[in-house]
């Protein structure tokens, strides 16, 4: 957060979650979005001029030097702890909002029409056949070991089957990790 204040000024503190603002950073046109993939205070900076990528990178690294920032990827552990979905990992285009716990965002009683409204009404009436839920996984801490056949940077499927006491598959785990904060395996 301090790096963003140093780059853009104190207005960044007033940017609400999932809001964005078009602005410039030393004549580099950008869109700043208050988002994040880990549940922490996060921002995304989108270039509006792709030719200025190196300039933007250098500005960010320079502003981050006092804070010892370094390039990295998002934290899978923090994402799972925060309950933030990863598209294709936790949900797909074939899922509906009722299955993934987003039904609070769907108003089927509104006067306005939208694509899929009738299909969603039917699903609500008939009920869902599956539900995305959070669970605790007993046992030794889960490690995030990527099999050697996967190239770094590519999607690694890690869906684990979940069986009932009769060993019948009743679902699958989409994302999992050992949470150091909670001191247990979560999914």
Provide a role label for each language-model segment.
Residues 1-187:
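Conserved, structured C-terminal
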């Amino acid at each position: 957060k301090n790096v963003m204040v140093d780059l853009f000024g104190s207005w960044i503190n007033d940017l609400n979650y999932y809001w964005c603002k078009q602005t410039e950073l030393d004549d580099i046109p950008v869109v700043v979005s208050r988002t994040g993939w880990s549940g922490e205070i996060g921002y995304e900076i989108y270039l509006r001029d792709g030719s200025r990528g190196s300039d933007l990178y250098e500005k960010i690294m320079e502003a981050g030097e006092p804070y010892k920032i370094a390039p990295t990827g998002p934290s899978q552990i923090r994402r799972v702890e925060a309950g933030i979905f990863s598209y294709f990992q936790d949900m797909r285009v074939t899922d509906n909002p009722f299955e993934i716990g987003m039904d609070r965002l769907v108003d089927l009683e509104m006067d306005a029409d939208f694509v899929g409204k009738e299909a969603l009404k039917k699903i609500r009436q008939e009920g869902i056949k599956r539900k995305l839920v959070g669970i605790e996984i007993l046992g030794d801490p889960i490690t995030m070991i990527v099999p050697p056949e996967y190239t770094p940077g590519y999607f690694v499927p890690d869906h684990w089957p979940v069986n009932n006491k009769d060993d019948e598959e009743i679902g699958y785990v989409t994302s999992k990790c050992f949470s150091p904060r909670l001191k247990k395996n979560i999914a």
